[in-house]
Swiss-Prot record:
The gene is hutI. Gene3D superfamilies: Metal-dependent hydrolases (3.20.20.140), Urease, subunit C, domain 1 (2.30.40.10). N-formimidoyl-L-glutamate binds at residues 151, 324, 326. It comes from Fusobacterium nucleatum subsp. nucleatum (strain ATCC 25586 / DSM 15643 / BCRC 10681 / CIP 101130 / JCM 8532 / KCTC 2640 / LMG 13131 / VPI 4355). Belongs to the metallo-dependent hydrolases superfamily. HutI family. The keyword Hydrolase applies. This is Imidazolonepropionase.
């Protein structure tokens, strides 16, 4: 076996390889100094510490001395509303002044504003806008992003969002995992006919699946959005069609969406700021990943999800940006990690696990990405920081030094 690339003299190497089969949040391998990674083509072929075995080296092997830097798997942002038209900075002053969201909505703002902008945008306009976001994410060390639809809310514009996501996968290095989320809100044309829209979403499901445009189906199970019964109907059909499931749940009130996620065997339940003991118990007795979005709580000045309580109950947690034009207009997963430490009281190992192997589990990609292990994709991020603790302590800057995607250098500061 001959190496194309060797990264060596690594300071702290966070492989995120799980050391046992438990759901513990701190059970990941960390090589404390002088680590190395050997890469052949797009795969990792060796990981260790000390001197690299000569059997891997040829005169053509590229040797990169990382001079004691922090190295992790490529970060994974497992919950975003990536593709959307427009922005909502005009609502920011109203929010600061304390204007309620429903009042903003009545003035044509909120999700209705983004709905209009997304419907009016061409595919090319959405591509150009989203490419900028993906570049920001890559520069922050992110190599895989989940992307939801849900700002079209009709067949034509939901397909447009999903087609744009597919095209973007070919135009830049970040891997995109697509989620169909027409059940994000009820569009104005169905304002007085919620049942009609539920049926419309169910009709869209086979069309999206037939075109191979989405791997997951998500729904906003929330008071005055979609009930538990409506969510169950949509997600049951989706599951029968071969979609994997996600659920926005317990964001504003606890409606039973978390319990539904466990009942249906969803891959993840997301938000969870208002999760109850019943919901925690349901997740603890399932394999559902709790995908928490603390930058949304930060931006809305709302309560954070009870991460410590969930961790102590044996729940696996991922952290994501929730990047969207309303409640979290930020692509910065590094900041999310720092909030995770400071406000969710997560340890460095817990934080880094939540954006690597657990984030991979939240998009069902744990067999190929999310950890630095032999046989996995060589998606690797190098940070100009000596340790996980320093990275989390020194907030507000971009720590990324370089990013490797499938064994190729795709970003260098």
């Amino acid at each position: 076996m001959q190496a194309d690339l060797v990264l060596y003299n690594i300071g702290q190497l966070v492989t995120s390889r799980e050391l046992d089969k438990t759901k513990k949040m701190d059970n990941i391998e960390v090589i404390e100094n002088n680590g190395y990674i050997v890469i052949e083509k797009d795969k990792i072929v060796a990981v260790g510490s000390g001197e690299v075995l000569k059997e891997y080296l040829t005169p053509a092997t590229e040797m990169v001395d990382l001079s004691g830097k922090l190295v992790t798997p490529g970060l994974i942002d497992s919950h975003t509303h990536l593709v959307h038209g427009g922005s909502r900075e005009n609502e920011f002053a109203m929010k600061i002044a304390g204007v309620p969201y429903l009042e903003i909505l009545e003035k044509g703002g909120g999700i209705l504003s983004t709905l209009k902008s997304t419907r009016n945008a061409s595919e090319q306009e959405l591509i150009e806008k989203t490419l900028k976001s993906l570049r920001h994410m890559l520069e922050l060390g992110v190599t895989t992003v989940e992307a939801k639809s849900g700002y079209g809310l009709n067949l034509e514009d939901e397909l447009k969002q999903l087609e744009v996501t597919k095209i973007l996968g070919y135009l830049q290095p970040v891997t995109l995992v697509s989620t169909f989320m027409a059940a994000h809100a009820t569009p104005p044309e169905y304002k007085d006919n919620k049942e009609g829209y539920v049926q419309e979403v169910i009709k869209m499901l086979p069309i999206v699946k037939e075109r191979n445009l989405a791997e997951f189906c998500d729904i906003f199970c929330e008071d005055k959005v979609f009930s538990v019964d409506e969510s169950r109907r949509i997600l049951t059909v989706a599951k029968e069609l071969g979609y994997k499931l996600k659920i926005h749940a317990d964001e504003i009130v606890s409606l039973g969406g978390v319990e539904l996620a466990a009942e249906l065997g969803a891959t993840s339940a997301e938000h969870l700021m208002k999760i109850t003991d019943s919901g925690i118990n349901a997740l603890a007795n399932s394999n559902v990943i709790a995908d928490l979005l603390p930058a949304t709580s930060f931006n809305l000045m709302e309560h954070y999800a009870p991460a410590r309580k969930m961790i102590e109950a044996g729940i696996q947690i991922a952290l994501s940006t929730d990047y969207n034009p309303g409640s979290c207009p930020s692509e910065n997963l590094q900041f999310v990690m720092q909030i995770g430490a400071a406000h969710l009281k997560m340890t460095p190992k817990e934080v880094f696990k939540s954006v690597t192997i657990n984030a991979a589990k939240a998009i069902d990609k744990q067999d190929t990405i999310g950890s630095i292990e032999v046989g996995k994709k060589a998606d690797i991020t190098v940070f100009d920081a000596p340790s996980m603790a320093y990275f989390l302590y020194h907030f507000g800057i971009n720590h990324t030094d370089s990013v490797y995607k499938n064994g190729k250098l795709v970003f260098k500061k």
